[in-house]
């Protein structure tokens, strides 16, 4: 599989790929703010549905800054 390089961070700009803690689980998704209190976590796979949740339930752990792909 691929390896991602993550820079530790507590916040991220809209559209950045983040490592986020949601309900005590870690996920890798693009983050988008939907209004003042909602966040959309968008998977890279278009076949999967985005996650819409209150912003207070998402804790950004880091921002993806690189990708190592094995061929």
What does each of the following model-derived ranges do?
Residues 2-71:
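Acidic/glycine-rich C-terminal interaction modules and beta/coil loop segments
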């Amino acid at each position: 599989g691929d390896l991602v390089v993550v820079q530790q961070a507590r916040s991220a700009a809209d559209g950045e790929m983040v490592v986020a803690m949601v309900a005590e689980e870690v996920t890798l998704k693009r983050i988008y703010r939907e209004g003042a209190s909602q966040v959309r976590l968008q998977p890279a796979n278009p076949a999967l549905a985005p996650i819409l949740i209150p912003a207070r339930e998402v804790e950004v752990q880091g921002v993806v800054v690189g990708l190592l792909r094995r061929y």
